[in-house]
Regions:
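Mitochondrial intermembrane space
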Residues: 20-133
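Bacterial N-terminal signal peptides that target proteins for export
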Residues: 1-9
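C-terminal motif of bacterial Sec signal peptides marking the signal peptidase cleavage site
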Residues: 15-18
Length: 133
């Protein structure tokens, strides 16, 4: 009986903590929403906007500059996605950095299927749904 109680307590704790056992880390995937878009569509959009992989903790993503991150953010907003986390935009939060993407007249890149298919993620994992043409 004690073992069952411990097991149920552990499951409840993991559920409350929001852990997803066996699943990939979500990070940016969970931060974006758009009507009709599932996790796969969010992943595709992130890759098409220039994110190396759809998972924040991947080493390729850690190498990005603040301007690169702000550019991906701007691309996602331009495509109709909403940042669920909030807390201000990259341009607001890094105003003192004078990011190129935040300057008047800066060109915000559009989503690119070519960029997604040539991303480090899709080159390494072509079997993933995000990497289907």
């Amino acid at each position: 009986m004690k073992q069952i109680l411990k097991l149920l307590s552990g499951i409840a704790l993991l559920s409350i903590a929001g852990c997803s056992l066996g699943g990939p880390p979500t990070g940016s995937l969970a931060a974006w929403e758009k009507p009709g878009a599932d996790f796969t569509e969010v992943g595709k959009a992130l890759l098409e906007c220039g994110m190396p992989t759809p998972y924040d903790m991947d080493p390729e993503n850690q190498k990005r500059s603040i301007n690169a991150k702000a550019t991906i953010y701007a691309c996602m907003i331009q495509d109709g996605f909403r940042d669920k986390v909030g807390g201000g935009t990259w341009c607001e939060n890094y105003k003192s950095e004078n990011l190129p993407i935040c300057q008047p007249g800066a060109v915000i890149p559009r989503r690119s299927v070519k960029k997604r298919l040539n991303s480090p993620f899709c080159k390494q994992h072509p079997e993933q749904y995000e990497c289907y043409p």
